[in-house]
């Protein structure tokens, strides 16, 4: 029996020059929302980001070292038993967007596999990330499984 494809790790992608991957400090809610807006993704109230980050296992950010702008982001949550979830995957549109997405995915998955090796991993991601997810072994909606969300008001 061959190992599941998402458990195999692809080669580590290189970040383009002048970008830095970091876990600390956490980006501000304002910076995360600015990134999400640039990606055409929905934003959240700035004050809710500190709560979301405090309830996350960790977050990974990519910062442009030239102007210290947040250009990539992803965060992880888990029940620490069976399930891990990756949220808010975003990378600034432009020539480096795919490289930034691939770096975030690679490092997030490597960390989850190391820290929570038995967990199933799900991800909420924009359509532009599909190719990178497939390279990491993800299968789009395997067996017809569909994720659903409910926005609470």
Question: Predicted regions span which residues?
Answer:
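Conserved acetyl-CoA-binding loop-helix of GNAT-fold acetyltransferases
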Residues: 97-111
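Conserved GNAT acetyl-CoA-binding A-motif
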Residues: 112-125
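C-terminal binding/interaction regions
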Residues: 135, 148-152
């Amino acid at each position: 029996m061959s190992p599941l494809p998402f458990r195999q790790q692809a080669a580590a992608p290189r970040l383009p020059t002048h970008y830095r991957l970091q876990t600390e400090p956490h980006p501000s809610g304002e910076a995360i929302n600015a990134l999400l807006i640039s990606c055409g993704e929905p934003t959240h109230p700035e004050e809710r980001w500190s709560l979301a980050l405090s309830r996350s296992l960790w977050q990974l950010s990519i910062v442009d070292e030239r102007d210290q702008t947040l250009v990539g982001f992803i965060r992880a949550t888990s029940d620490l038993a069976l399930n891990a979830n990756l949220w808010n995957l975003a990378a600034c549109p432009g020539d480096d967007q795919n490289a930034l997405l691939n770096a975030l995915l690679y490092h997030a998955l490597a960390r989850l596999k190391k820290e929570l090796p038995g967990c199933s991993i799900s991800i909420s991601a924009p359509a532009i990330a599909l190719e990178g997810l497939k390279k990491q072994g993800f299968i789009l909606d395997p067996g017809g499984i569909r994720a659903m969300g409910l926005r609470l008001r």
